[in-house]
Swiss-Prot record:
Assigned keywords, A-Z: Cell cycle, Cell division, Chromosome partition, Cytoplasm
Phylogenetic classification of the source organism: Bacteria, Bacillati, Bacillota, Bacilli, Lactobacillales
Job of this protein: Participates in chromosomal partition during cell division. May act via the formation of a condensin-like complex containing Smc and ScpA that pull DNA away from mid-cell into both cell halves.
UniProt subunit comment: Homodimer. Homodimerization may be required to stabilize the binding of ScpA to the Smc head domains. Component of a cohesin-like complex composed of ScpA, ScpB and the Smc homodimer, in which ScpA and ScpB bind to the head domain of Smc. The presence of the three proteins is required for the association of the complex with DNA.
Record organism: Lactobacillus johnsonii (strain CNCM I-12250 / La1 / NCC 533)
Identification of the protein by name: Segregation and condensation protein B
Family: Belongs to the ScpB family.
A single GO BP: cell division
InterPro entries cross-referenced by the UniProt entry: ScpB_csome_segregation, WH-like_DNA-bd_sf, WH_DNA-bd_sf
Length: 196
């Protein structure tokens, strides 16, 4: 008879990319939440410390998954013909952060925030699996709504969107600033005399 840890590993393997939610695992394994955490931590450590294992155990949004280990990233990348180790461009990172903090959001809303077209970088992010289309906005034209994926959380090592760093909100100052105040000694008259 298999151990509970072996059963957990087999269930997660069988579940594939979708993984299994905590509640499902508790029912299937017939164990307590504390016992599941202990099993999961032991399995995670065993996979991490086994130099012959190409797998890792992760938990994202209360869903446990077996995934390939980052130490095997090069060969997996070669297999999928996607260079996942390649850095994202500055514009892609900017778009990704906008989506992460404002999701669901349309391309036009992203373009308005950035002031430039974002279509190309959006396609790159979709192709890399970091964002996805999650429905349509109920406005004329019914544009796609973009959200981050579980792979986004995995890629940046977050368990949920609540783990994202908090960004201070900047409120617009209602009082306009006069950049060329006459009383400001820094705004001296410049003399363009010839020969100087």
């Amino acid at each position: 008879m298999a151990s509970k840890e072996a059963e957990l590993e087999a269930l997660l393997y069988a579940a594939g990319d979708d993984g299994l939610e905590t509640e499902n695992l508790l029912q299937l394994l017939e164990i307590s939440p504390a016992a599941l955490r202990e099993l999961a931590n032991h399995l995670k450590d065993r996979l991490k410390n086994d130099e012959n294992s190409g797998l890792q155990l992760i938990c994202i949004n209360q869903t446990y998954k077996l995934t390939t280990s980052p130490k095997c990233g090069d060969i997996i990348s070669k297999f999928f013909q996607k260079d996942l180790s390649k850095n994202l461009s500055q514009s892609a990172l900017e778009i990704l952060s906008i989506i992460a903090y404002r999701q669901p959001i349309t391309r036009v809303e992203i373009d308005d925030l950035r002031g430039v077209n974002s279509a190309g970088a959006l396609q790159t992010l979709v192709w890399r699996g970091l964002i996805k289309v999650d429905g349509k906005k109920d406005v004329p034209g019914h544009p796609n709504l973009y959200v981050t994926t579980d792979y986004f959380l995995q890629y940046f090592n977050y368990e949920s969107l609540a783990d994202l760093p908090v960004i201070e909100e900047f409120e617009a100052d209602d009082n306009p600033v006069n950049l060329f105040n006459q009383d400001d000694s820094r705004n001296k008259e410049i003399n363009f005399d010839e020969g100087e």
